[in-house]
Amino acid sequence: PETTAERREAIEQEYEQLTRTVLDQNRDNLFGVMLLSQQLGYELSGQELLDEIAKFPAEMQQTDALVRLKKNAEQMIKTDIGQPFIDIAQPNADGEQVSLESVVRNPANKYVLLDFWASWCGPCMGEVPHLKKTYDEFRKKGFEIYGVSFDEDRGDWLGAVEQNGMNWLHVSEVKGFDNQAAKDYAIQGIPSNFLIDGQGTIVARNLRGEALYEKISELLAQ
């Protein structure tokens, strides 16, 4: 029998196919631009996004929305799978600057998950049980999480960390999306994550639900 995960994947594929069909019918108007940026943009790599933008008529490519999206896609390419990570240095709960580089270069860490989230983001908090399960299982085997919060309220940020038992590394500028890391990693929305290996290379992106546990399990078994 079909599992829930398989069913969900089938529905997601069907939805993406339908979205692409509607997108192809609306490349000459702003509805098509909205579909690409808000529906498909989150799933595509930087290069795939540039390829989609190139299919729009020249006059549509001059619109503010597509110009912004193209700039974002060009930045995304810098953090695609296979690219080196971009360093981040932000304050932890004690106000001490903690750099992503120091975590990645720590010999004890074979893989580091750079996780962008916020306490007000429902889907982010929905991922917490999966993050906890993976962290608890693999933290002593070389897996670490570097969480970057896009909260604007320090109390909300640290309260969520404590109440949900998120026992990994946390940093935040407490400025919402007005965060240098959001620009460097071309974050379109959250939750968003990047898996970095011990050499500092991005090896996976946006691992959700059980996919994170399965990926770490597979990598650490090698």
Question: What is each model feature region?
Answer:
Residues 1-103, 108-109:
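Oxidative protein folding and maturation machinery
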